[in-house]
Amino acid sequence: MYAFPTTRIAPRRKQPKCIKPPKCTSKYDIKFKDIAIYILERKMGASRRYFLMELARKKGFRVEPDLSEYVTHVVSEKNSGAEVLEWLQAKKAGSIPNVAILDISWFTDCMGAGQPVEIERKHRLTLQKICVCKSPSPVVPSRVGVSQYACQRKTTLDNKNTLFTDAFEILAENYEFRENERSCLSFRQAASVLKSLTFTIAGMADVDGLPGFGDHIRAVIEDLIEDGESSKVSEVLNDEVYRSLKLFTTIFGVGLRTAEKWHRLGIRTLEEIKSNENLKFSKMQIAGLQHYEDILGGVRKAEADAVAMVVRDAVWTFLPDAVVTLTGGFRRGNKTGHDVDMLITSPIQGKEKELLHKVINLWKKQDLLLCHTIHESTMDEDNLPSKSVNLLDHFQKCFAILKSNQHRGEISSCDGPHDSRERGKRIWKAIRVDLVFCPFEQYAFALLGWTGSRQFERDLRRYASHEKKMMIDNHALYDKTKRVFVKCESEEEIFGHLGLEYIDPVERNA
C-alpha cells in the first residue's frame, strides 16, 4: 500500500497551445469537390509542402491545410504506411473514417492528368494493424552503448523517430538563422542520436542515458509525447522572420546574409523579389529564380543517375581513365535529394586539373549548361587538416545548373507549375549539379567527406581530435602524436587508422 502525502502537489500546468499553423489565403476554383487532400509535411519539409498544395489548388483540387474530418485523401512522401498511421494516431486522427492513405505517386499522377485518378494498388501505403494486447514480458529498449559520436553509430534511412527529429531539425534551422550555433548543434546532435535508434521513443524514460539530451531538448520531447506537437515548433513555423528566411534560402545562390537583407527591406514573397527593381542579383540568383520550381522540386534517383551519366560522358571524352563517382545523399541510399554531387579524379597525377574547363566548354556547345560558377583550387599540400568542422575543402569545384534532357511526362509533374505552352516546348528539367575535382591520392578522404552526412562528418572530425589525437578533413589524416600524415587508399583504411568499425555509406545517415 502506497502512503499518499497530505500536501497536495499541483500538476505542472502546460502552456496553452494557442498558436495555430497559418491558414492558406489563396483562392482558386474547386473543380473536384468530392475529395479533400491533406499533404503530410513529415519528411517533406514546409517549403515543398506549400509548393505542392498551391500546385494542386491551381489545378482545381481541394487541399486542406490542417487535418480534419473533411479530409478524404492523406498524401505522404518517403513514409511507410505504419509511419503515417503512427503520425495520425499521435494527432488523435486515427479514427477519421474512410480516409485513403496514399503515396505521393497518386498525387503526381493526378497532377499529370489534371484531374483525380483512380487509386491503384501501387498508390496505397501498406498499413499494419497494431496489436493492443498486453505482453507478459515487455521488451525494454536498450540505450546502453549509444555513442555521442555519429561515426560510432549505424544510422540507416529507417528513422523510427521522425516525429521528434522533424521537430528538432526545424528548431535547429531556426537557431542557425538566428546564429545561435550552440543550440543549433545541440538539436542537430540530438536528432542524429534519435535517427540511429532501433525503437520508437514512447516515454521520457526512453531518452534516459542518451548523450546530449539536456532539459531544453527533453522539454520538446515531452510535449511531443503528450500532445503530438510542440508549442516551440509551432512558434517557429508561425514566426515571420523564420518563414521569410526559410523561403528566401530555398532560392539557388541566396545565402543567409542576402535573405536577412531582403527581409529587412520588407520583402516577404517571391513575387515581391522578382518585381523589386532596386534589387541586384548575382547570375546564380537569377538562375535560381528562373528555375525555382524545378530546383525546389528536388532530384529523384533516376534523374541523378541520368545526370551522372552526362557527367561521366563529358569527363571520359577528355580523360577515359577518370574516376567519376556519384556521392552525397544518393550514395547513402536516398531516393531523392536537392542536388547531384559528383567527385572526379584521375590515377594520372595532375590530369584532373585540366578537366573542368573542357567539360564546361563542351556543355556550352551541347546547350546543357544553364548556369555555373567555378571555384579554383586553393589547396596547399603542406597544410595540416583543418581544425574546423564547418570549413569547406580546397578542391577545384563547379556549382552548376544543368538541363536534364528527359521528357517532362516522365518527370514528376510536381516538380514545377508550368503552363501548357511551356510544357509543350520544354523537354528538360533544371537540376543542380556540384562537380568536385580532387587529386587521386586524396580521393579516399574526399569520397568520405562528400558522402556525408553532415553530422557524420562533423562527429568524425570531433572523434579523431578528442579520442585519437588526430586531425582529418576532406584532404588528409594527420597523426598529431607522431607528427606524420597517414596515407589511406580507401575509406576502410581511414576507419581502420582511427580505430573505428567500418560503416557502410547507407548507414551514415546521421
Curated annotation (Swiss-Prot):
Residues 254-258 are annotated as: Involved in DNA binding. Its main location: nucleus. PROSITE patterns: BRCT (PS50172), DNA_POLYMERASE_X (PS00522). The keyword Transferase applies. A 2'-deoxyribonucleoside 5'-triphosphate binds at residues 329-334, 338-341, 449-450. It is found in: Nucleus. It catalyses: DNA(n) + a 2'-deoxyribonucleoside 5'-triphosphate = DNA(n+1) + diphosphate. GO terms for molecular function: DNA binding; DNA nucleotidylexotransferase activity; DNA-directed DNA polymerase activity; metal ion binding. Pfam families: BRCT (PF00533), DNA_pol_B_palm (PF14792), DNA_pol_B_thumb (PF14791), DNA_pol_lambd_f (PF10391), HHH_8 (PF14716). Residues 27-124 form the BRCT domain. Template-independent DNA polymerase which catalyzes the random addition of deoxynucleoside 5'-triphosphate to the 3'-end of a DNA initiator. One of the in vivo functions of this enzyme is the addition of nucleotides at the junction (N region) of rearranged Ig heavy chain and T-cell receptor gene segments during the maturation of B- and T-cells. This is DNA nucleotidylexotransferase. It comes from Ambystoma mexicanum.
